[in-house]
């Protein structure tokens, strides 16, 4: 049902279906109602609407049936909720709901609040993943393996060290999120359609009532910009792209041709014709969805490009890509955490590869140099011995005992993993 455009007439089902955002607005519906309740209460506080009308509107908002609204044929959630209120309390009271606001500033506020809610859920998932990584890193602190550069066996590390490198990524991502969240915590309310409103709204007071920390200063920018969404989405996708490299490692290592990882039974499927197969389907799907997230980010950017300052309905099409990215991240982190908790690592095979493929050569060359031989001479000497098959290399256990902070030294791995686990015992983490 068209409400705002009813005075124009026309439209019809085709136009309504094509332009309606109701299917996407489910993501912000609760935030929209919360903002409206706070807005109406503020209007009553500053004395521009009758307090009785505000109370009646608030009661109607408490009773909103979201399923019924979704079937109402509306342009968007804002129109649907206002029509719901007016139908229940009449225009004499419900008609005040539209004062001092625009869909432009209100949807920008709802997107910010919904994004903050979803990021909070994501951060809880990240905390659980970090705990799983730390526990397994402690378990595999002494488990020697080759690292890989250029997908060739490289320097000897331990699987515990490898797991802590994922934890390091999560920590950096958490820092990046902490940097972008202040952008989301700035309120656009009171900006109106582009240049503010005549109603004497105290923007800072209204912002504080909703949990915002600041206001977006310029009204045109406040209601028409989606920079905050692009910034948050780009950070999340950057994390996912980096995470996909580890996902790909696990998929490769699950192959019996490499044989480092045995995936949990719950994460594998088999072939319809080859019953021996143990396909790591959860991580294959995650790998694909991370690529989809890159596409969503590109679409989010592209929708905003060249539409001019101020709100256009193009922006309605951008928001769904933000939600898709956050969903991919949240579900992916949960799946990876469950995988890490249940995987088995073949330390015997990994150690054998570290030995077989000269993964201790750099440490051996360093050890020779530290005994007084110039490093490059030691390097070429060892290279010649490897070529002849006569090299006497350090064992993987000897090689990983490096003195540097953050190294694969099992003691360093235990120190770092134990430090992480301390936080796992506190609800705040």
UniProtKB/Swiss-Prot annotation:
It catalyses: 2-(N(omega)-L-arginino)succinate = fumarate + L-arginine. GO terms for molecular function: argininosuccinate lyase activity. One of its GO terms (cellular component) is cytosol. It is found in: Cytoplasm. Its EC number is 4.3.2.1. Pathway: Amino-acid biosynthesis; L-arginine biosynthesis; L-arginine from L-ornithine and carbamoyl phosphate: step 3/3. Its main location: cytoplasm. Keywords: Amino-acid biosynthesis, Arginine biosynthesis, Cytoplasm, Lyase. This is Argininosuccinate lyase. The gene is argH.
